[in-house]
């Protein structure tokens, strides 16, 4: 094949390579790869180590926020070393660097948070004062809202690292994204799931996204991997994230569901200690002409209402 392969940038973690490998196969097929073809001749995966992967002993908010998972990859995209990037959408900041766009979102995996423990089947069943491991401010606040007695243990690292810490007894239970467990072939270890209506996951959780330079957004192969229903749901969720100025210093959850042309959504934000919770629910009937704009507008409206009610109390200041 004379054409140069598409160069796909992705984090070098085990989970990132697993999910990026799935997208590599999809992209190669969209470019014409057949069952027996070498997909690397059509789409080449280029692992990039990010600052977020290198620094594992502190919360993201202490070292620069979600952008640390994307900065080096986006620099490679902007200077032409790669042609596109694969990310977990929940890791993407509310605003992107100039010149880059979220070009395609494939079908979403399970968006729920998974509860994993050797001593309890559900979060509600943990003993008084039990230790819950998470580095997510949202998961911390949602857990403390229903179980204020829990001790939150800061637990960063990849999935294997967190599971190993659980095995060593550093926590009595942990919360992880079910989508990541599924993509690693570990979906069976989950004890139970958090209800996404009672505890909405991070905006975009469970979805992957292909980021490109703005001038490449209409390339034909991108259209082949897009899922319209997921695209609209995450447009609403990211609209809420933007309205709430979501970051690693805010506990923001959003979950949108598309049924036909009706998009239903719930948005919530909590104070970091979980004591106060502010939430809004709403729906919109989408038209075929400007559905993405309408979906985002719903998220902006609900997120704006939550922000107006919660105010400065929603931001972790220390």
UniProtKB/Swiss-Prot annotation:
Named in its record, the pathway it takes part in is: Porphyrin-containing compound metabolism; protoporphyrin-IX biosynthesis; coproporphyrinogen-III from 5-aminolevulinate: step 2/4
Q: What is its EC number?
A: 2.5.1.61
Q: Which PROSITE patterns does this UniProt record tie to the protein?
A: PORPHOBILINOGEN_DEAM (PS00533)
Q: Name one Pfam family in it.
A: Porphobil_deam
Modification type S-(dipyrrolylmethanemethyl)cysteine: residues:
248
Any one GO molecular-function label of the UniProt entry: hydroxymethylbilane synthase activity
The alphabetized UniProt keywords are:
Porphyrin biosynthesis, Transferase
Q: Which domain of life is it from?
A: Bacteria
Give the cofactor note text: Binds 1 dipyrromethane group covalently.
Entry-linked InterPro entries = HemC, Porphobilin_deaminase_cofac_BS, Porphobilin_deaminase_N, Porphobilinogen_deaminase_C, Porphobilinogen_deaminase_C_sf
Report which reactions are catalysed by this protein.
Answer: 4 porphobilinogen + H2O = hydroxymethylbilane + 4 NH4(+)
GO cellular component: a single term: cytoplasm
- Cofactor(s) in the UniProt record: dipyrromethane
Task: Supply the enzyme class, top level.
Answer: transferase
A Gene Ontology annotation in the biological process aspect, one of them, is: protoporphyrinogen IX biosynthetic process
User: What protein family does this chain belong to?
Assistant: Belongs to the HMBS family.
Provide the assembly information.
Answer: Monomer.
* Other remarks in the entry: The porphobilinogen subunits are added to the dipyrromethane group.
Q: What does this protein do?
A: Tetrapolymerization of the monopyrrole PBG into the hydroxymethylbilane pre-uroporphyrinogen in several discrete steps.
Q: What is this protein called?
A: Porphobilinogen deaminase
User: Which gene does this sequence derive from?
Assistant: hemC
